[in-house]
Amino acid sequence: VLGSRGLGDVYKRQHILWTLAIVAGVSVANLYYNQPLLNIMRHELEVSEFKTNLIAMITQIGYALGLLFIVPLGDLYRRKNIILTNFFLLIFSLLAIAMAPNIYIIWAASLITGICSMIPQIFVPIASQFSRPENKGRNVGVVISGLLTGILASRVVSGFVGEVLGWREMYFIAAGMMLLCAIVVLKVLPDIQPTFQGKYSGLMKSLFSLVREYPSLRIYSIRAGLAFGSFLAMWSCLAFKMGEAPFHASSD
């Protein structure tokens, strides 16, 4: 269970930890709903495979921007407010994708979706910060497990919903789930005070200082980026290839 560390007994309740894990999985799924749906979207929007595949790429670019520029704000401002703001922006962007008349609006909304889907990366330090030393590794592992489950389950869910209901309906459902997550976070997550006393510019400089001072960090970052990039490239192309002969597979 989460430790209090002086912020009240609420952090001792195990349901907060599981709430973080579940909401992390549900929110990170927004990054991957599009991958099994790309071929369906291409046919409806009547665009090329290249333009359709940019949806997945732009979403991931947005996610990288969110990790770099938004996640550090958790040390500067109240994390609960940051999380709720991003949830409501996600609702807007997911609805925009669901109702988009053309590929260009989907690109713009996908960028916003990617930026705002970095929410689970704010949950991870929350679980670590308010854990007793003997429980810290386990609690962080629970949240990470929820995140990875969301990454894997998102493709199964979106493929099935896309085939049965349609790709637009998947994004309507996703927007509804973000509203539900926002309500849960509002009710369950305690208000956490920021720990950094400086300015945003100083916070960003400290990030680049870490990269400069620790060569192993650079190596691990490059390795992780290449590995996950390969993984995403495979999934993005798979929807188109599986829809062709001799497979003729649907999104599910």
Could you say what each language-model-derived stretch is?
Residues 1-11:
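Single conserved hydrophobic/aromatic residue that forms the stacking wall/gate
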Residues 9, 190-221:
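Juxtamembrane intracellular "pre-TM" segments in multi-pass secondary transporters
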Residues 13-33, 111, 213-233:
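Pair of pore-lining "gating" transmembrane helices in MFS-fold secondary transporters
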Residues 19-49, 120, 234-239:
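Extracytoplasmic
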Residues 32, 60-68, 118, 151-152:
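Residue-level signature of mid-helix packing/kink "hotspots" within the transmembrane helices
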Residues 65-103:
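Conserved MFS/SLC helix-loop-helix module at the cytosolic interface between two early adjacent transmembrane helices
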Residues 105, 142-187:
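Helix-loop-helix hairpin linking two adjacent transmembrane segments in secondary transporters
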Residues 109-145:
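Cytoplasmic helix-loop-helix junction between adjacent transmembrane helices
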